[in-house]
Amino acid sequence: MGNGTRLGRVRGLGSSHHGSHHWLQQRLTALGNVLLVTWLLVSLLRLPLDDHAAVHRWASNPTVALALILLVISVFWHFRLGLQVLIEDYVHGEAMRLLAIVALNFYAIGGAAYGIFAIVRIALVPVAGVPGGM
């Protein structure tokens, strides 16, 4: 079967087996999000939310800060995976699709970096003696 037949023209254009990896990543990040958001909600419900210093001390705990950073990474990764599928399926034109995916990657990386920076800043800046302020 040479290049002149229909089979020859489509040979090599089949599944590249990236779909199952992408699907698995999406499910694993969803599971991570469920676990981490559940932990976050339970933790926040146990805190005195009217006490800024207590919430700040809680967020300054290295274990809590690490879990919050993992939550930010997992949420933005899951967000990027889901929107990438939508862009690949519904954005027509190679240039527009490439532009949309590049913008999505910048937005996801930038949002995650900003969230991580905020968590690290909260964890490293001591609580001032003034109630409600830093």
Predicted features by range, described:
Residues 1-134:
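Membrane-embedded alpha-helical bundles that constitute the cytochrome b-like, heme-associated redox core
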